[in-house]
Design a protein with these regions (language model features):
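Non-catalytic pre-domain segments flanking phosphatase-related domains
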Residues: 1-21, 191
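Alpha-helix termination/capping residues and helix-transition junctions
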Residues: 13, 68, 194-197
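The start of beta-strands in P-loop NTPase/AAA+ ATPase cores
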Residues: 17-19, 72, 201
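Active-site phosphate-binding/coordination module
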Residues: 33-127
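Conserved acidic, metal-coordinating active-site core of Asp-based
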Residues: 111-202
Length: 202
């Protein structure tokens, strides 16, 4: 990873209009959002740069982030949805229909039971109660860090059920579907700001 200072004099073909960023261990330091990091969001907003957090964190968190942070929207649960607050109204877009999400939650409950049975020390993430599209298994946030072999075992259990599983810095997140952080970010940029995928990635 390179220090951002290396890019201070990087030539740009046009001004920066958007900043898409992770939250955990990117915006946060030791699990906390510092005053400096939060203040920087307001500075970016004043500079005309639209900030969009892209996170594996749950719908409950994203509701608050979209409503109270100076951001243009937020992509949550690894692309399961995006939320956008404007004109005193929360706008929510989901990668899947309500019926599909309900069916997937039932399948995730089976995976949850299997993980807790087969991987001692693993726990359901403390924020699982406000998730709508995925299952998050805690392997080091609020539990003693599990060995890498156990983390890989959790991933394998998800994959044995044909679910997608991704390892973050604190959780293994699993879901059903083809959505990703990138795909939903591109959908959000198109729906809200009219950017094509090519324009968004320039």
């Amino acid at each position: 990873m390179k220090n951002i200072s290396e890019y201070l004099n990087y030539p740009l073909s046009k001004p920066i209009g958007f900043l898409l960023t992770d939250i955990d261990d990117t915006m946060t330091t030791d699990g906390q959002l510092t005053s400096e990091a939060y203040a920087s969001l307001f500075k970016l907003q004043r500079a005309g740069i639209k900030v969009i957090p892209i996170t594996g964190r749950p719908a409950g968190w994203c509701e608050m982030i979209a409503r109270f942070w100076p951001v243009a929207g937020v992509v949550g649960e690894n692309g399961g949805f995006y939320f956008h607050y404007a004109d005193k109204k929360m706008h929510r877009w989901f990668s899947q229909s309500t019926g599909v999400r309900v069916d997937n939650q039932k399948k995730l409950e089976i995976i949850q039971a299997e993980v807790l049975k087969q991987v001692p020390g693993a726990e359901i993430s403390s924020d699982q109660f406000c998730r709508l599209t995925d299952l998050a298994i805690d392997f080091c946030e609020d539990v003693k860090r599990l060995p890498n072999s156990d983390v890989k075992k959790i991933v394998q259990i998800f994959e044995n059920h044909q679910a997608i599983a991704k390892i973050s810095s604190i959780h293994v997140n699993g879901w059903f579907g083809t959505h990703t952080k990138l795909s939903t970010s591109l959908t959000m940029l198109k729906n809200l700001f009219g950017l094509t995928p090519d324009e968004a990635q320039q």
